[in-house]
Amino acid sequence: MAPSALLRPVSRLLAPARLPSGRASARSKFYVREPLNAKPDWLKVGFTLGTTVFLWVYLIKQHNEDILEYKRRNGLE
């Protein structure tokens, strides 16, 4: 297969998007709004951070229990 045949689909991906012709509507069919960065949802932020802290504490606690169990089973303690 010729290299130019392989590069043709890649060049299509890199080409700029074509705008619709005059008879088609140029208006977007989807409404896109800006995210509300100036006014964060503090309930969601608190829930996310609380969940993260809980999972890290649980992970470290479980790890320490696993280490103690490993030492007990192998006679290291």
Swiss-Prot record:
UniProt transit peptide range: 1-28
Q: Name one GO cellular component term.
A: mitochondrial inner membrane
The record, for Pfam families, names:
NADH_dh_m_C1 (PF15088)
Localization per Swiss-Prot or TrEMBL: Mitochondrion inner membrane
Task: Report whether rRNA-binding shows up as a keyword of the record.
Answer: no
Could you list this entry's UniProt keywords, alphabetically sorted.
Electron transport, Membrane, Mitochondrion, Mitochondrion inner membrane, Respiratory chain, Transit peptide, Transmembrane, Transmembrane helix, Transport
Q: Which residues form the signal peptide?
A: none
> What residues form the membrane-spanning segments?
42-60
- What InterPro entries does the annotation carry? NDUFC1
At the top level, the lineage of the source is Eukaryota
Q: How the protein sits in the membrane?
A: Single-pass membrane protein
Quaternary structure and partners: Complex I is composed of 45 different subunits.
Q: Which family does it belong to?
A: Belongs to the complex I NDUFC1 subunit family.
Q: What biological function has been recorded for the protein in this entry?
A: Accessory subunit of the mitochondrial membrane respiratory chain NADH dehydrogenase (Complex I), that is believed not to be involved in catalysis. Complex I functions in the transfer of electrons from NADH to the respiratory chain. The immediate electron acceptor for the enzyme is believed to be ubiquinone.
- Spell out the protein name for this chain: NADH dehydrogenase [ubiquinone] 1 subunit C1, mitochondrial
Q: Which organism is it from?
A: Pongo pygmaeus
Taxonomy of origin reads: Eukaryota, Metazoa, Chordata, Craniata, Vertebrata
